[in-house]
Amino acid sequence: MGYTHYWTQTRDFTPQEMNKINGELLDIVKVSGIPLGGWDGTGSPEFTTETIGFNGKGDDDGHETFRINATRKLPFEGASPDRLGWAFCKTAAKPYDIVVVACLTVLAAKHGFDVSSDGGAKDWEDGVKLASKALGEIFTNPMRREEAA
């Protein structure tokens, strides 16, 4: 299954801003109760002032890594400069997908990320609810804005 989320990080972040983002996204991880691993599904998720990265835990529940960096990067060597900060994560709708969706909801609402997805607003509802519960704020479903456009 190729269920994928896409985003563009519109600016670089300072270490202080990354610490704030780390706190927000770690709250989501804790409230979710979903086991997460490092980039390859083993070990621990990475939450530093340079990088945030995680995957589902193990071979069955992991798929592709969700990663953001303090400094925007091109998605691949030779990519057009207008792709600076663009990335994606194919979750295949595995259990960690709800955490990815919740994180992208917060990043879009509070940190200027542009997000899109193979899924629609209904597919994002549980992730948006998780973000709201974890941070104690009401978040708008970013896919509702995309569908209205």
Language model segments and positions:
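Acidic (Asp/Glu-rich) sequence patches and key acidic residues
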Residues: 1-149
